Amino acid sequence: MPSIAIAWFRRDLRLHDHPALTATIEAADVVIPLFVFDETLLGGRFASANRTWFMRESVAGLSRALAERGAALRLVVGRPADVVPAFACETGATQVFVTRDAAPYGRRRDRELAHRLAADGVTMRARRGLYVHEPDEVLTRDGRPFTVYSPFRRAWEALERRPVLAAPDRIPGPATGARRRDPIPEVPPPTADRALIPVPGEAAARDRLAAWLARGVDGYADTRNRLDDEDGTSRLSQDLRWGLLSPLEIVERADGAGEGRRVFTGEVVWREFYAHVLWHYPRVLHEPFQEAFAGLRVADDPAALEAWAAGRTGYPIVDAAMRQLRASGFVHNRARMIAASFLAKDLLLGYRLGEAEFMRHLTDGDVASNNGGWQWTASTGTDPQPYFRIFNPVLQGRRFDPDGAYVRRWVPELALVPGARIHEPWTMTADEQTAARVRIGTDYPAPIVDHPSARERALAAYAAARVAAQ
């Protein structure tokens, strides 16, 4: 009897540098690729039509790539703890290979599933692949987790990397008569404009990586914060989120001399740092890492939250960020920080509201990175910015969108506003508003808060929380 093993794809929708797939091929005579449309994730708190659509289209690409190598991707819908054991029984598989997950839900799911499979005589085997170094292997000298980025990066860089694996030429599937390529379930359309979402699938992701390494990475240190430079960042975040690209391969191919490559690699390390934090401190999904701010008194202002989410705050750089999010399912990282600071500090709304809003729309939405970024900006997380650092949206706009190109693209009401006024259009005279064909307070909102006053309110609230925690 030939040995049969399942290669269960999850957040690793690729064939290149896929340790779990390679291990499956080495361990069994017959390999059955599987993808589960997990009903728990599709309907969870952080569910996103944009992310689900991108995933579905990437699964379609994976199915085609597997078929070219002689294997048929099987697809099931349901809870993994129920459908995977049933599928293993149906196919006669004795092993299930997966890429190790680091998120709390994934870890719980895999523990439960391993027990259920074991009861049926099936072994579940996990391999690395989502990160260059696993979240639990980068530790201090005394074996503790890091809570500060810089020493984490030094320890991360000191670890030896495994070799990058080639994609398999052939995958030994079942006999021809037993092959079955399942239809891919339909999902709701994305809420973002499809034309603004990067092409899904591993092949397109590899093209993006090649283009970035050829044209952009060397200048990254200078361009990464420029909101008006669409080619200033890699736009690989959704590819990392769904494992269309291996982070190890990205780092290996980006290695080299130059500040741009060093800074770019540092962003990959930030992703791994936040996964490390979530692995060791899963409570951060429900509460601030900095316990001193657990009692921070936040505002209850649904109207302000809606204005922020809709890009109607009256601060053009904030509104451009939020409109980019809704229109494209993506936001430039600098714009994410500006919008997050405005919600958490100017509006003094709980950062978890913003965290959830981002996850509803981001095609690249990653639980660890999104939580880490929000807590960093809100000054409640690991290695955060100081609580008294509050972004001034006008100054941020002038610095990172000096000519207003980013604002004009996403806030077209302000397209004719002169550069000197683009980041504070409320200062225009009536005649200037007429010339710019925009009436502040009618066509475009006046600021919903006064930044200097909001800053003082936030400082007082954070200081009071620290005193109360002592």
Model-predicted regions and their roles:
Residues V122, G143-F293, F400-D401, A405-Q470:
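Glycine/tryptophan-enriched, flexible segments
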Residues D231-G419:
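Active-site-proximal binding-pocket segments
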Residues M1-V164, G260, A460-A465, A469:
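Trp/Phe/Arg-rich N-terminal binding region typifying the photolyase-homology
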Residues A20, S58, L62, A205-W212, ...:
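Alpha-helical packing segments of well-folded alpha/beta enzyme cores
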